[in-house]
Amino acid sequence: MTLLRAPQRFQYASRVFTSTSLSTPRHAYLTYSRVRSLTSTSHHPTKSHPSLSSSTSNTTSVEENDAPKSQCTPQASQHIPWYLQEESSVPAVSEVTLQEKLPELPENPPKILPELLEYIFKDLGLDELKLIDLRPLETPSALGANVIMIIGTARSVKHLNVSADRLCRWLRSEYKLSPYADGLLGRNELKIKLRRKNRRARIASRTGTMFDDKDDGITTGWICVNAGVVEEHPVEERVEGDFEGFGPLVGGTRVVVQVFTAEKRAEMDLETLWEGRLARAQRERQKHADAAKDDAPEEVRYPNSISPSPSDYKSPNVPRSWISLPHEQRRQFHIRSLRSFARPAHHAVFTPRFMSQNHTPAEHAIVGSELSSPTAMLLQYITTMPDQQLMSALGDRPDDESSTDFLRLFHHSLLGASPNVLALARLELLCLAHSRGHTGISKESVHRAFMGCCFSASHIPDRLIPTVVDILLTPRTGDNPDGEKWFTDADKELALSALDQLVLRGNDFMNLQFFTRLYYLSSLPPGPPGEENDDGLTPAERGAHVVRMIEILDIPFDPIHARTLMVYLFRNGDYDAFMKWWRTLPLKNSPRTREDYEMLFRLHADSGDSRLTRECISTWAPMMSREDPPIWLEGDLVAHLRDCLLLADERTPARAAEGTQSLFAKLWRACERELNKSEVV
């Protein structure tokens, strides 16, 4: 009994618990209708706690007060746990719909774009979506032409990789596309790298060393998902002079999704970059549109107008040039006669009657087809002049502007012309003078006119390009044209700069004809003989790099220019390269002919090298009968072979007369028989 009796100071607690458990359910104290305050009291019952009777009476009174409430509200007697209670309805401050969070669609969007945006925002969970339409850019980006770029922010690095991986799988499964995610790690690869990184961190913490948290390629924070072409459309015809930024021109719209983390997106700031480019492109288009609007003629009349208004007549100063180029001067519609062009009084020698003469189609091709331009007609007229009259009309220097009446009239017709028209007209005149044999044309003037056409984006006719290249690749000579020739370093710089521009314009110089001429020019000395600028190299050493370029670049074989190159190689002393090309002829489906053997023996006879000539006769004279078809001794071949035999051994005629059966003696007797036959005939 003593063990079951509670201590005296805790008797009230046991009685309170007993009375409470008998009167009310245990969980009644957990309801929200009653709140129990927390107080700090002493453990002595006489000071801090009321008597047992008062406590019991208070409890009973409280229960009696609660009884009527439970009877009035029967639902209150049923306890609802806190995790099952319904939250109080809080009015929504601002509800943003899905369409309001998605960016607006551009004009003419591809069919996949709305579904792609919804999938990126709703399923992948990317935030702050931004759509940039790069299709208006004339020069496409490195991603290609006609790009629509979507920029989104991921919540973490793991979310970044998972979103990009799911997007690629969705594009492949739903639309059969072939997306490429630049910077994406595979699922297993990312887990393995993260696991290894955590292991290194644990090992570093155990050993007490510092963990080098370097950039290991896991947390790049940027993945570019290129979906490729999502909608095909026909490729527009390219305008000549237009450029494609990177890669070939492909029709269709491509979509690129740029996924960033928040920090990386703020660092890269692609929105500012591309929006700035779009703004500049828009300003350029607006500038061209305003210029075209200002230059547009106020009124265009049909050619069959009978009574034109007096305001339609304009001053006949400088009409439009014959060169039709985009973004140039405005085109004027008129029906004026050719005789209506005004001309100065001191140019009476050029009367209008030559402008109405009948010209051949070839002359039309030289100067253009728009006969309404006085510049074109002046060039057309000068093509009909005899050579002597043309030389006097052009003077000593055709690049001069006032030395002759023709040059003054020619440059007067170009007053007010645009820079590209002016440069091309001067280039036309210089090329025309060179084609007629004028010797006063300088390379500098042709190069200046040519580069002016290139810098002004002028269209250079194909017929002028060979003439320009021929002028710039012509060696310099002294007073004697047949004397020594040289090609200076300044001439090389002029030629290379012009060739660079021609290659950029799409001209093909990867042919043996061009490289043969390069070899000839590179083998020339850099200055006149007797001056200090001689480099001390032999012609073969100067042109050796061109021969190596022909082999490395695998220049296509040309039978005619290959034989020309062989002549240059032999005369420059590069016998090994000559014999290499000589043996290559049959392998290139170009069998050796009688003319080839005539060239072979003529070059050896002119060389004066007896040892080299002796080897040539011993090796290749017996091969003539083995060629397909066989080559017999006749014509000029006999004379060249006799010269080689005399150079190889002066005693060959005497030994042949003695009846010696050596190869040289037999060949000499065969040559003598052929010469006797030709004399008899």
From Swiss-Prot:
**What SUPFAM superfamilies would the database entry show?**
Nucleotidyltransferase
Could you tell me which Gene3D superfamilies the record lists for this protein? Answer: Beta Polymerase, domain 2
Its topology with respect to the membrane?
Answer: Peripheral membrane protein
Which residues belong to the transit peptide? 1-45
Gene Ontology BP term (one): mitochondrial gene expression
Compositionally skewed regions (Low complexity) per UniProt = 40-61
Biased composition of type Basic and acidic residues is found at 284-301
Region Disordered: start-end pairs? 40-74, 284-320
**Which residue intervals are annotated with compositional bias (Polar residues) in the record?**
304-314
Q: Which UniProt keywords apply?
A: Membrane, Mitochondrion, Mitochondrion inner membrane, Transit peptide
GO terms for CC?
A: mitochondrial inner membrane; mitochondrion
Q: Where in the cell is it found?
A: Mitochondrion inner membrane
Q: Name one Pfam family in it.
A: RsfS
Family, per the entry? Answer: Belongs to the ATP25 family.
What the entry lists under PANTHER family is as follows:
ATPASE SYNTHESIS PROTEIN 25, MITOCHONDRIAL
Role, per record: Probable mitochondrial mRNA stabilization factor.
Q: What is this protein called?
A: ATPase synthesis protein 25, mitochondrial
